[in-house]
UniProtKB/Swiss-Prot annotation:
Pathway: Isoprenoid biosynthesis; isopentenyl diphosphate biosynthesis via DXP pathway; isopentenyl diphosphate from 1-deoxy-D-xylulose 5-phosphate: step 5/6. Binds 1 [4Fe-4S] cluster. One of its GO terms (molecular function) is 4 iron, 4 sulfur cluster binding. Belongs to the IspG family. Keywords: 4Fe-4S, Iron, Iron-sulfur, Isoprene biosynthesis, Metal-binding, Oxidoreductase. Pfam families: GcpE. It comes from Helicobacter acinonychis (strain Sheeba). InterPro entries: Dihydropteroate_synth-like_sf, Enolase-like_C_sf, IspG_bac, IspG_bac-typ, NO2/SO3_Rdtase_4Fe4S_sf. The gene is ispG. This is 4-hydroxy-3-methylbut-2-en-1-yl diphosphate synthase (flavodoxin).
């Protein structure tokens, strides 16, 4: 069951609203040296093209921090500076970027956090309290270990610390490298604070393992109404993080966009090269933003039933197939002629729907 989204305080990262009922935003992180402005800009451009709303960059040294001023001028996305250990880099970054991420486990003393808060107050930019199970503050790690309770206590402690500094322009993340702790931590903290949540499974692995872990953890939370922005952590290409994030948003019912492909897993009854056809259809129609259910079925057993509920469908027969639009057969063609005709019909339907929506 899809729950109503939890109402949270709204903050802004650049022009992107986070929380308060705003659309759930997606983000990724560049892997270039941030001081290499051109390489970093190129990666941000790739993320923008992939559909990202925000981007985070590592600030590992003073050279990176000083480069942010120029990078901000050329970035097509709101820029978040990722700070670990060295609070002074956050003070420099705050002069240029749209948000600061700090790790309370390594940023330092209350005085250092206060300095970061003061810098962010001056520029009216938000902070992310980025709690990681693997790098909790000493007092929480010693008492609880890398547990759900430890993460939640760290988040509450740091939220109170910022509130005591009269600063409420922040969001919170609670990241672990496994599904169970991730879900339980966000669930435990959600009723205790009003602040928006940044969702993610940290160090989730390669494309396959990260996609599974993230879909289970984040998809479940999103369906419960929890989450305001998200990052899929993948060891691999930047674009995949955004592709997977947007797919999770679609399949959890939080984003109405693009093609939902319905295709059978194949069996001895199929009468066409269904694997090839489904792959070609998905690739050729990936540019469509209009939400459409598209069915590609290999035989008549389930094809006609699925077609009744799909916007457009192919039902394969013996070296031929039917194209079905909104439950009605509109073409019966030889297999070789199906693909291009089907693509054209789907594109035309998308245009029709867009006119209706506008």
């Amino acid at each position: 069951m899809l729950e109503n989204r939890v109402k949270t305080k709204q903050i802004f990262i650049g022009g992107v609203a986070i929380g308060g009922g705003a659309p759930i935003s997606t983000q990724s992180m560049t892997f270039s040296k941030t001081a290499d402005i051109q390489s970093t800009k190129n990666q941000i451009d790739r993320l923008k093209l992939a559909g990202a709303d925000l981007v985070r960059v590592a600030v590992s040294n003073e050279k990176d921090a000083l480069a942010l001023k120029e990078l901000k001028k050329v970035s097509p996305l709101p820029l978040i500076a990722d700070i670990h250990f060295h609070y002074k880099f956050a003070l420099i970054a705050a002069q240029s970027v749209d948000a600061i991420r700090i790790n309370p486990g390594n940023i330092g003393s209350k005085d250092k956090i206060k300095a970061v808060v003061d810098a962010c107050k001056e520029k009216n930019i938000p902070i992310r309290i980025g709690v990681n199970a693997g790098s909790l503050e000493k007092q929480f790690d010693q008492k609880y270990g890398p547990t759900v309770k430890g993460m939640v206590e760290s988040a509450l402690y740091n939220a109170k610390l910022l509130e005591d500094l009269d600063f409420t322009n922040f969001k919170i993340s609670l990241k672990a490298s496994d599904v169970i702790r991730t879900i339980e931590a966000y669930r435990m903290l959600r009723p205790l604070v009003i602040y928006p949540f940044h969702l993610g499974v940290t160090e989730a692995g390669n494309l396959f393992s990260s996609s599974i872990k993230s879909a289970m953890a984040l998809g479940g939370l999103l369906m419960e109404g929890i989450g305001d922005t998200m990052r899929i952590s993948i060891t691999g290409e930047l674009e995949n993080e955004i592709k997977v994030a947007r797919a999770i948003l679609r399949y959890s019912g939080r984003l109405k966009e693009g093609i939902n492909l319905i295709s059978c897993p194949t069996c001895g009854r199929i009468e066409a090269n269904l694997v090839d056809m489904a792959g070609k259809v998905e690739k050729r129609l990936s540019h469509i933003k209009t939400p459409l259910d598209i069915s590609v079925m290999g035989c008549v057993v389930n094809a006609l039933g699925e077609a009744k509920h799909a916007d457009m469908a192919i039902a394969f027969g013996n070296r031929s197939g039917l194209i079905i639009k909104e439950g009605k057969v509109i073409h019966k063609l030889a297999e070789k002629d199906l693909f291009e005709t089907f693509v054209t019909e789907v594109e035309n339907l998308a245009k029709e729907r867009e006119k209706t929506l506008n």
